[in-house]
């Protein structure tokens, strides 16, 4: 029997029908073996980061319970992105996208390998991630001991 972990996935989109796309992404994740979506934060309209000349984003976070490894969960996230029309590698790195699914946290695991870093390396810098994480779990603590609530106050 595989161990279940609480995982958090960042949701983002700034092209097309953003809300419908993010709703569909959550549905596809919920229908995936080894993944149970337990909560989804409020979706927030946010300004782009890193590449300003693009439409505003709709961002949120989904809380999952999963028995998938971090790598297997990331693979499923990338698969869902492809199913929803995302083509990685086109345009600027932080440019417009139909959908963006980021593995933010996977239990207490810390992973640093090619193509996968958990916790997400820019998690603590991004209010559009911290605010929905705090909404879903006001007591959430990162694997390094920092509390999301404290990061929001910084």
Feature roles, as predicted:
Residues 34, 49-57, 68-154:
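Flexible, gly/pro- and Lys/Arg-enriched active-site loops
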Residues 1-6, 150-154:
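Short, low-complexity, intrinsically disordered N-terminal peptides in bacterial proteins
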Residues 21, 25, 73-76:
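Hydrophobic side chains in well-ordered alpha-helices
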Residues 3-23, 34:
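Extended accessory regions or peripheral subdomains of proteins
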Residues 24, 29-69:
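Short, surface-exposed acidic-centric catalytic microdomains
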Residues 14, 40, 132:
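Residue-level signal for inorganic ion chemistry
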Residues 13, 62-66, 105-107:
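Short beta-strand-to-loop capping motifs
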């Amino acid at each position: 029997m595989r161990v279940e972990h609480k995982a958090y996935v960042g949701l983002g989109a700034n092209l097309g029908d953003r809300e419908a796309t993010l709703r569909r992404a959550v549905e596809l994740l919920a229908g995936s073996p080894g993944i149970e979506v337990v909560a989804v934060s409020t979706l927030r309209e946010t300004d782009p980061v890193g590449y300003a000349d693009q439409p505003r984003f709709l961002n949120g976070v989904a809380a999952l319970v999963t028995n998938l490894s971090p790598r297997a969960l990331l693979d499923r996230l990338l698969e869902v992105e492809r199913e929803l029309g995302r083509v990685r590698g086109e345009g600027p790195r932080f440019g417009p996208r139909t959908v963006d699914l980021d593995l933010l946290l996977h239990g207490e695991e810390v992973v640093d390998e090619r193509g996968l870093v958990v916790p997400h390396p820019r998690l603590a810098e991004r209010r559009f991630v911290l605010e929905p994480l705090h909404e879903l779990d006001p007591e959430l603590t990162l694997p390094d001991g920092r509390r999301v609530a404290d990061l929001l106050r910084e």
